């Protein structure tokens, strides 16, 4: 019986600690996934509703690109690992996001920049079920030091803090219909 309790305690301990993470700890861990290139873990930290919104936008862009079918297919294959928009629609939002990150940030100079970036969460401001985490990011880009203070929004979903899309990214998605692109 003691073995069962010990094993159960060991298995449940990470769940309890994840539920008790502060918004700052979540943002630190989120940026650590960028540093390490663990884009699956990054996607798992995102708000599911934000990922669904992103997927809708990406499918809309793929449908309305105005470029040749060959160019669209090449872009879809390179970015998402799919052959056409039907396959893109079939992807789970978290998988679409992970593949997009891997394509854009997973190699070359961006990979190098991200692996050396440092993030220090400074605090947060609560607004309803959302916390706006203020953090300082320091990195080297082409020999230049960049040091910026920014804000990352997180929302409590099912008892856990989940990362939201930044305001500028969400605004870009919302502007797509005005530009004639149906997300």
For each feature predicted by the language model, list its residue ranges.
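Bacterial N-terminal signal peptides
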Residues: 5-14
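Short, low-complexity N-terminal intrinsically disordered segments enriched in polar/charged residues
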Residues: 16-40, 44-70
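Surface-exposed, charged secondary-structure patches
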Residues: 20, 63-142
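Generic detector of well-ordered alpha-helical segments enriched in charged/polar residues
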Residues: 28, 52-55, 59, 73, ...
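Short beta-strand edge/turn micro-motifs at domain boundaries
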Residues: 108-109, 120-124, 132-136, 144-180
């Amino acid at each position: 019986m003691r073995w069962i309790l010990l094993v159960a305690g060991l298995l449940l301990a990470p769940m309890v600690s994840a539920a008790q993470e502060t918004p700052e700890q979540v943002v630190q861990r989120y940026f650590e996934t960028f540093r390490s290139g663990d884009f699956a873990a990054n996607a798992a930290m995102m708000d599911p509703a934000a990922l669904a919104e992103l997927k809708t936008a990406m499918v809309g862009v793929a449908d309305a690109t105005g470029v040749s079918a060959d160019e669209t297919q090449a872009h879809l294959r390179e970015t998402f690992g799919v052959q056409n928009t039907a396959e893109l629609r079939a992807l789970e939002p978290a998988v679409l996001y992970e593949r997009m990150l891997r394509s854009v940030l997973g190699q070359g100079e961006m990979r190098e920049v991200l692996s050396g970036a440092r993030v220090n969460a400074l605090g947060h401001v609560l607004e309803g079920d959302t916390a706006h985490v203020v953090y300082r990011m320091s990195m080297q880009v082409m020999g230049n030091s960049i040091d910026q203070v920014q804000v990352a929004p997180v929302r409590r979903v099912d008892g856990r803090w989940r990362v939201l899309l930044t305001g500028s990214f969400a605004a870009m998605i919302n502007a797509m219909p005005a530009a004639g692109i149906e997300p």
